[in-house]
Regions:
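Double-stranded beta-helix
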Residues: 114-173, 193
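Non-heme Fe(II)/2-oxoglutarate
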Residues: 10-17, 24-25, 134-138, 161, ...
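Short acidic/polar capping segments at secondary-structure boundaries
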Residues: 77-84, 94-95, 102-103, 111-116, ...
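Non-heme Fe(II)-dependent double-stranded beta-helix
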Residues: 1-90, 96
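A generic structural micro-feature
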Residues: 86, 99-103, 178-180
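Short, P/G- and charge-enriched loop/turn segments at secondary-structure junctions
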Residues: 93-96, 149-151
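Short, conserved beta-strand element in jelly-roll/cupin
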Residues: 65, 91, 98-116, 155-156, ...
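Glycine-rich phosphate/pyrophosphate-binding beta-alpha loops
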Residues: 93-95, 104, 171-175
Length: 198
């Protein structure tokens, strides 16, 4: 199933990369053609990915953690290119898209094996209880200034899922490998949740 998901995503990610290459500096907001790309709204372009987002695994997770009335809030593929030296900084997903009620659910799906060498996720446990934290704007995106000493590394095999609240601070490290680190992120919110525009 992972191979089929990659097969669906790759052409769209290629188009995003090519579009970024045509822009000044090869970047737009936090996407960088040669470093990290964000390919969004894939379920609106691929019936297979729409079906994947409705897989019984996600339905079961959402029912257990959110309740029976859930909708897909956001989806994106994040490809971290080989040799990317920068980490993607500490942030909460709510720091990018704030909704009420605050917490929604992030399913971070590894499409390739990922560990400390190629940009696996790290999380900071417990801080989700403090709500949405202050984020500073940086060249690499919104960042929460945090001491990383208590953080937990989440190495994942392809097909594995890291599940956390949109209020959980997390980051990904650099990709020092010679392969693309591929992930697909599905986020689910309670039905009726509203996006708050600040």
């Amino acid at each position: 199933e992972v191979a089929q998901v990659i097969e669906q995503i790759d052409p769209y990610e290629f188009n995003v990369t090519e579009a970024l290459k045509g822009l000044d500096g090869g970047k737009f907001f936090i996407s960088r053609a040669e470093e990290i790309t964000f390919t969004t709204h894939l379920v609106t372009q691929s019936e297979q990915l729409k079906d994947f987002s409705r897989h019984k695994v996600f339905s079961s997770i959402c029912r257990d953690l959110i309740g029976p009335d859930v909708r897909l809030y956001w989806d994106q593929a994040v490809y971290k290119k080989p040799g990317t030296k920068d980490e993607f900084p500490w942030h909460q997903d709510n720091g990018y898209t704030f909704i009420e009620p605050q917490a929604y659910l992030t399913c971070w799906i590894a499409l390739t094996d990922t560990d400390e060498t190629n940009g696996c996720p790290w999380v900071m446990p417990g801080l989700h209880q403090k709500g949405t934290l202050f984020h500073e704007p940086t060249d690499l995106g919104h960042e929460i200034p945090l001491d990383s000493s208590e953080s937990i590394c989440l190495p994942l095999k392809a097909g594995s899922i890291a599940i956390f609240s949109s209020l959980t601070p997390h980051r990904t490290g650099p990709n020092l490998s010679d392969g693309i680190r591929k992930s697909y992120i599905l986020q689910y919110a309670p039905d009726g949740a509203k996006r708050v525009i600040s």
